[in-house]
């Protein structure tokens, strides 16, 4: 039996918590679309696994640790669609500053790959904390 969409996303979040950024792009379909309505300075859309790979590679040098907490994944009537609610415990490693941010993500996952996601993150708070590093 194929792995559920919820199980795939839980594994993905585990990698984030382990700072294994280089592996994350492998969870996306080649033509995946990621929408980030709260991205700044303007909403963002990232298209394709390789564009995501480049984006994640840029995270590796940041003094930032994200630990997913209180993860709840809601399955829907469509087995490919899940809604994930969770907090990140954010640590700025250079200053020791810690705080939590809320996140909601709507994902379509099939054949073990993320096809699309709409990510609602508090990027402003994280960006502000990184600017104080």
Indicate residue ranges for each PLM-predicted region.
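Short, cysteine-centered beta-strand-loop-beta hairpins and adjacent loop/turn segments enriched
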Residues: 90-100
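A short hydrophobic beta-strand element
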Residues: 78-88
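Short beta-strand segments enriched in hydrophobic/aromatic residues
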Residues: 28-29, 88-90, 105, 121
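Short, low-complexity N-terminal intrinsically disordered segments enriched in polar/charged residues
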Residues: 1-26, 30, 132-133
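Short beta-strand edge/turn micro-motifs at domain boundaries
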Residues: 81, 104-128
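Hydrophobic/aromatic beta-strand elements that line small-molecule binding cavities or substrate pockets
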Residues: 68-74, 88, 102-107
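A solvent-exposed, acidic/Ser-Thr-rich amphipathic alpha-helical stretch
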Residues: 27-77
